[in-house]
Amino acid sequence: MFLLAQEKSDTIEFIKSELVQLLSNMRQEIAASRQSQTGAACHHIEYCMDKIQRAKSSVTIALPIESLNLEITTMLRQQLIVLPPEARKNWDQIKKLDFKYCHLK
């Protein structure tokens, strides 16, 4: 009887450790996904800022801003990305430009 109880205890401990490992793996996957998407968003922001700086007319400025605004805002709202300070600063600049040129959309 004692041996049976001991085996059951080992099994419970084993299952607990398996669950802890599974949760740890899930957290790592979520963190990696966020980092990946954050990197992609930062790259996209830089790309659009570059496009905006090279733009020759305000119409060409408004179009990438509108596209970027929808994408980034959606990802931020769903907490898929966390913008680092530099990207946040660039994003704020883009949002100001978006407001400035919103009549062209």
Briefly describe each language-model feature range.
Residues L22-T74:
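Amphipathic alpha-helical interaction modules
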